[in-house]
Amino acid sequence: MNIQALLSEKVRQAMIAAGAPADCEPQVRQSAKVQFGDYQANGMMAVAKKLGMAPRQLAEQVLTHLDLNGIASKVEIAGPGFINIFLDPAFLAEHVQQALASDRLGVATPEKQTIVVDYSAPNVAKEMHVGHLRSTIIGDAAVRTLEFLGHKVIRANHVGDWGTQFGMLIAWLEKQQQENAGEMELADLEGFYRDAKKHYDEDEEFAERARNYVVKLQSGDEYFREMWRKLVDITMTQNQITYDRLNVTLTRDDVMGESLYNPMLPGIVADLKAKGLAVESEGATVVFLDEFKNKEGEPMGVIIQKKDGGYLYTTTDIACAKYRYETLHADRVLYYIDSRQHQHLMQAWAIVRKAGYVPESVPLEHHMFGMMLGKDGKPFKTRAGGTVKLADLLDEALERARRLVAEKNPDMPADELEKLANAVGIGAVKYADLSKNRTTDYIFDWDNMLAFEGNTAPYMQYAYTRVLSVFRKAEIDEEQLAAAPVIIREDREAQLAARLLQFEETLTVVAREGTPHVMCAYLYDLAGLFSGFYEHCPILSAENEEVRNSRLKLAQLTAKTLKLGLDTLGIETVERM
């Protein structure tokens, strides 16, 4: 149920009947304050100006054509021409019933699209670090939301599995007796990478062999391809452990690494030359883009093939976008890549559009994100100044959560404690990130993220268990409750019901903007409204059974909405805390 969309269409039709153009925007928004109703239509200002009318005069005319019978109990004009809409309690009650009768809580499915989501993208032969956290969990929350809305989502894990470093790694692997490679763990590979690089820098004979191996690998020699595959397999097996711990939905089947696009690169360079988009410049092949200027104010040159014949990331990203449209048949492509890559992507996509590889009707969207910072406001590092491994971060989260849970539940059985600590610890790390606007940097703070107050995972998980506890105390028969009517008489009942029915609107924003923090804010607000409702509207000690059952149904929909909302974020819920 998308009340905002329903009201938008009703107000738009009334505006047209009042003389507004057919493409007018009613600008229906959820009201910020209860005294302004549940929704507010703010579109009169812009339209009245075009019509040469006072906004309030237009609003009055719109009201004469606006039929919200059975939807709103009151509609009023406020200020210079805002239209405040107060939803009818009977309308709210009816749609709460409908939401409870649906597995999807009444959420409709929009027109199905094929959406490619590019996220996570770790490098082969390196362990995942905290820099991979944001892309991985924000991208996964977007994927979960889009899939819930019924879209066909293709996860694209664009791993760094190609490049000149593989000659060096294969040469070192060979030197270390390659037959043991399959048993190596990634922790070994971290040191393995450093040792290989050290030898490459210090031993010219080794470096020469590594350079030859790159050529053989790139020419498709089966022995070197097999060695390369071992490195990829070891890395992705280890990364899968991290993905599973993080409760993200990526698997090995979602890997679409840089190597996938290699066969396309010569053809793309040749095609861009044939189209007159790419030219030779100082031995390299370059595309000059008018949209980007260099320091002299001239069109910026983007190299797509180096003087030595090598290709660049831009060339790969051009091929990647082309593949996603032509082969995967994407209607929309989302890239969860940090903000530092923005200009690079914009340049690659400008070339893609000019070449006609992806039509303008297919959006290529950079859902960029800021950095994770330490308490000092600098990039998050170990005490020694090194990069924090993601596995180490999750280990610490689990250990801190274990202590926290044991402190609050000293008699809890060990296996139950471990399960709860995992849900709280991993949930806390994810939620702390997801609850911040992805476009900004944020401070990583253990104390804040593990607090049981405020917009945190532990608070949200506790809020869910608190609602469930009402049902345990009620000892209610599910069938009996299902048949009971919902009655909304109190203001707090109406406020909670209206917020519950805004779940679909929240999902729609997350799907459109790729902003999971909007869902976090919604769920936090919902938990707060339930708390006020619970305090002021007695459930178990209600004046009669009809009111008791009605309030239990509001509590039931709250629990279902919290659980489903947290699930779209990849946050685990628990039955007891």
Swiss-Prot record:
Subcellular location: Cytoplasm
One GO biological process term: arginyl-tRNA aminoacylation
Intrachain disulfide bonds: none
Gene3D superfamilies: Arginyl tRNA synthetase N-terminal domain (3.30.1360.70), HUPs (3.40.50.620), Isoleucyl-tRNA Synthetase, Domain 1 (1.10.730.10)
Keywords of this entry: Aminoacyl-tRNA synthetase, ATP-binding, Cytoplasm, Ligase, Nucleotide-binding, Protein biosynthesis
Enzyme class, broadest EC rank: ligase
EC numbers on record: 6.1.1.19
GO molecular function: arginine-tRNA ligase activity; ATP binding
Protein family per UniProt: Belongs to the class-I aminoacyl-tRNA synthetase family.
HAMAP family: Arg_tRNA_synth
The protein's name: Arginine--tRNA ligase
Organism: Escherichia coli (strain K12)
Gene behind this protein: argS
